[in-house]
Design a protein with these regions (language model features):
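Short, low-complexity N-terminal leaders and the immediately following helix N-cap/first helix
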Residues: 1-88
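Extended, charged alpha/beta regions that create polyanion-binding interfaces
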Residues: 59-166
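Glycine-rich phosphate/diphosphate-binding loop of Rossmann-like nucleotide-binding domains
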Residues: 160-212
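N-terminal small/polar loop signature for handling phosphorylated ligands or for N-terminal nucleophile
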Residues: 195-235, 239-253
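Glycine-rich phosphate/nucleotide-binding loop
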Residues: 241-310
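Internal, active-site/partner-interface "lid" segment
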Residues: 306-324
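Conserved small/polar residues in nucleotide/adenosyl-binding loops
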Residues: 325-331
């Protein structure tokens, strides 16, 4: 690669795309990499501010931006992803399915801190749909040392990105509360849960309404588990009131309690546990009336069979003091 004056470029091969930007009209390549410059091209090149050009001069120790973009792509791509053509040295990955995007943040940092290259992704642990852009990547200079690209490639041992499909399809909902059990009010909680599950193709296949009786709730949870449900959601009875017995009922199933309480508002009284591989979740009343709560941050992960840890829940405190009523899925979960 060498630098020459544009007026002297006739007959030379361009090393990179030449971009034209017209506000509100276009931002695209005026000439593509590999184009042989003609006399007629000179005025156009000057009109986009190109008084000098990089033209091709073979150097086996260097890698062109397009080839380097493919190396970066190879570090990111995984199953259920597709990519298009390279434009102006950049290439993008897209999702082929409705699923949960996972990002290896440490590996991503490794690449972006290596110098002269970048990968920009969506936030991890977010819901993606077919056709959604997942990431874009390129090197910063026009060419880069092959040795440098080989080195960074050797540091990334598994794909930076992954899309997990939503595989949990059968849910049990245990509705608690004496006011519902005794027919004093209508159950308005369960329909909310059904709608949220439907966003991920999950169906409520078991439903029970229980009094404020921990033994009854425990019995119904265990009954649901024997019917092979993938996830159990217990609504209500999660606060410190004397009649709220759901946390004790979940504990008495023998489930492993990950956390009772979350650093997110709405959703402080949220409970997450697992019995074997089956999540058993305690949902506070805010889930019924607030459009988005901590439940929405976690549900997409649970239905993708992505295990949520105590540390990950604790990490939600940063940004957790937010009104989720104005958010729509996909919702950001940083951990």
């Amino acid at each position: 690669m060498k630098l020459i004056k544009t007026q002297d470029a006739v007959g030379h091969v361009l090393c990179h795309d030449i971009t034209q930007i017209i506000k509100g009209v276009t931002k695209d390549a005026l000439f593509r990499k590999g184009h042989i410059v003609t006399e007629e091209d000179i005025p156009l090149l000057l009109s986009v501010g190109k008084e000098h050009l990089y033209v091709w001069e073979n150097d086996e120790s260097m890698m062109h931006e397009n080839d380097a973009a493919m190396v970066l792509l190879d570090m990111c791509k995984n199953e259920r992803m597709s990519y298009g053509e390279i434009k102006e040295g950049k290439i993008e990955l897209k999702s082929e399915i409705h699923g949960l995007l996972k990002v290896d943040r440490k590996a991503l940092f490794t690449v972006n801190s290596f110098g002269q290259m970048m990968i920009a992704t969506r936030h991890g642990n977010t819901v993606v749909n077919p056709g959604d852009k997942l990431a874009g990547m390129r090197i910063i200079p026009l060419v880069i040392k092959k040795e440098k690209m080989d080195k960074v490639r050797s540091l990334i041992t598994s794909p930076i990105l992954e899309i997990k499909p939503f595989v949990l399809k059968k849910a049990a909902v245990i509705t608690t509360g004496s006011e519902v059990y005794k027919g004093r009010i209508q159950d308005t909680f369960t329909p909310v849960i059904q709608d949220k599950l439907a966003e991920f193709g999950c169906e409520m296949v078991y439903h029970a309404i229980c009094d404020d009786d921990d033994k009854m709730v425990t019995e119904k949870i265990n009954e649901a588990l024997t019917q092979g449900v993938d996830i159990v959601l217990c609504t209500g009875g999660m606060s410190v009131d004397p009649d709220d017995r759901t946390p004790l009922a979940i504990k008495n199933t023998g489930a492993n309690i990950i956390s009772y309480g979350s650093p997110v508002l709405p959703g402080a009284m949220f409970l997450l546990s697992y019995k074997g591989e089956v999540p058993i979740v305690g949902l506070p009343g805010c889930v019924m009336y607030a459009k988005r709560t901590v439940f929405d941050l976690v549900l997409c992960r649970l239905l993708a069979k992505d295990v949520v840890t105590y540390e990950e829940l604790c990490d939600l405190g940063e940004g957790g003091s937010v009104s989720y009523t104005h958010l729509t899925l996909p919702t950001i979960l940083r951990v």
